[in-house]
């Protein structure tokens, strides 16, 4: 969108320019204060070649971001909205659940406005885990607008997501230039911000933040200051801004971003990118190559995975139970811990049955008799 006019672009073209774009006049932009990223539902008319019209002009506007145009005029800018800690939990362990989503819900609960990062070495099942989380959120929370953003991914992964995930899939495959990666990511972020300004709950599942940062590093003008791994000192500012946009908004609306970060690839650049994003999220899910090598999935390192301020998402009862379970798992290796939890989850239907099933493991796992008695009483 320019100062004089704009275009409506379709998700079928990944919001890039095409011959099917719809022309929006300057008067309409000023009247309804339309911004970049607004989703508009309206009426178009056939272009008149005699007047030099090449695109379908927008004749009438019915809705902007699912709201009446008159109500959108007075909306607050995204920057002026007050961010809060996530306090409404995504129910990803109730209906249409998988073993992976139950484990995530236990150890790294997700809330509306979460800024989560899935740390994953190659071939540990990060894309599969992301797909399962997406399907569970879409099924249990139809009020949430779900966007799956695939950057620098394989074409077959894109097709798999489009066919098996109930959400909007926006992508730029690895054979596309870095400029396209950046454009697609920017328009998705702008769309999400505009929807949040109108009070909607939006979830972006990004695969991956590492490749997006690589794309920004390629297109950003050099500052003359190069970090280890060949990363420009200013190149990570924009991907940080993308990831940092996730927040829970006071008085309604939220933007949740769950992104994957790739590690242990042998690339120094990937390690530098991960270190830059390591402390920016408020939820971290760590995947372990040792677990994946033993063909145990989901390959989650339970002791290294957690959510900050989880007391806002869990009830006091569940919080106490989780504290005791973590104390039990602290004595185990990552492989033993996930195997222990997975075995018991497969035999139970809900949380209550799961908590009862681990009572039998208390005596053999807790050495101190005093600690054992206290934990048995609490569980």
From Swiss-Prot:
Q: Which Gene3D superfamilies match?
A: Nucleic acid-binding proteins, P-loop containing nucleotide triphosphate hydrolases
> Mind telling me which InterPro entries this protein's record contains?
AAA+_ATPase, ATPase_F1/V1/A1_a/bsu_nucl-bd, NA-bd_OB-fold, P-loop_NTPase, Rho_factor_ATP-bd, Rho_RNA-bd, Term_rho
**Which keywords are on file for this protein?**
ATP-binding, Helicase, Hydrolase, Nucleotide-binding, RNA-binding, Transcription, Transcription regulation, Transcription termination
Q: Detail which positions bind ATP.
A: 111-116, 123-128, 154
**UniProt keyword ATP-binding present:** yes
Taking every annotated instance into account, which residue ranges of this chain make up the domain Rho RNA-BD?
1-68
Q: What is its EC number?
A: 3.6.4.-
Provide one Gene Ontology biological process annotation.
DNA-templated transcription termination
Select a single GO molecular function from the record's annotations and give it.
ATP binding
What Pfam families does the record point to? Answer: ATP-synt_ab, Rho_RNA_bind
Q: Which residues form a coiled coil?
A: none
Question: Could you tell me which CDD domains the record lists for this protein?
Answer: rho_factor_C
Function noted in UniProt: Facilitates transcription termination by a mechanism that involves Rho binding to the nascent RNA, activation of Rho's RNA-dependent ATPase activity, and release of the mRNA from the DNA template.
Relate the assembly described in the record.
Answer: Homohexamer. The homohexamer assembles into an open ring structure.
Q: Which HAMAP family match?
A: Rho
Q: Give the similarity note.
A: Belongs to the Rho family.
Protein name, per record: Transcription termination factor Rho
Taxonomic source organism: Karelsulcia muelleri (strain SMDSEM)
Taxonomy of origin reads: Bacteria, Pseudomonadati, Bacteroidota, Flavobacteriia, Flavobacteriales
């Amino acid at each position: 969108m320019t100062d004089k006019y704009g275009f409506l672009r379709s998700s079928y073209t990944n919001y890039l320019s095409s011959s099917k774009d719809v022309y929006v006049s300057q008067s309409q932009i000023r009247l309804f204060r339309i911004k970049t990223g607004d989703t508009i539902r309206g009426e178009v008319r056939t272009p008149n070649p005699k007047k030099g019209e090449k695109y379908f002009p927008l004749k009438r506007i019915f809705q902007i971001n699912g709201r009446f145009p008159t109500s959108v005029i007075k909306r607050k800018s995204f920057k002026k909205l007050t961010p809060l800690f996530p306090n409404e939990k995504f129910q990803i362990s109730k209906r249409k659940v998988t073993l992976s989503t139950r484990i995530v819900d236990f150890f790294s609960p997700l809330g509306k406005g979460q800024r989560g990062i899935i740390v994953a070495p190659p071939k540990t099942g990060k894309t599969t885990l992301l797909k399962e989380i997406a399907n569970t959120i879409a099924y249990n929370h139809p009020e949430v607008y779900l966007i799956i953003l695939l950057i620098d991914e394989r074409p077959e992964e894109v097709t798999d997501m489009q066919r098996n995930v109930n959400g909007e899939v926006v992508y730029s495959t690895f054979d596309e230039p870095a400029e396209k990666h950046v454009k697609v990511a920017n328009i998705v972020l702008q769309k999400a911000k505009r929807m949040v300004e109108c009070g909607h709950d939006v979830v972006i599942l990004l695969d991956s933040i590492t490749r997006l940062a690589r794309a920004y590093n390629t297109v950003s003008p050099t500052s003359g200051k190069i970090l280890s791994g060949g990363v420009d000192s200013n190149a990570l500012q924009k991907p940080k801004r993308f990831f940092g946009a996730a927040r829970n908004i006071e008085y309604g609306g939220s933007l949740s971003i769950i992104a994957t970060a790739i590690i242990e690839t042998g690339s120094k650049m990937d390690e530098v990118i991960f270190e830059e994003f390591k402390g920016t999220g408020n939820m971290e899910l760590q995947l372990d190559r040792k677990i994946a090598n033993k063909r145990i999935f989901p390959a989650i390192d339970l002791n290294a995975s957690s959510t900050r301020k989880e007391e806002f998402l869990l009830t006091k009862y569940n919080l106490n139970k989780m504290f005791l379970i973590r104390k039990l798992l602290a004595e185990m290796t990552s492989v033993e811990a996930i195997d222990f939890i997975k075995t018991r989850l497969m035999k139970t239907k809900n949380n209550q049955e799961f908590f009862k099933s681990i009572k039998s493991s208390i005596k053999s796992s807790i050495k101190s008799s005093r600690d054992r008695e206290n934990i048995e009483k609490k569980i």
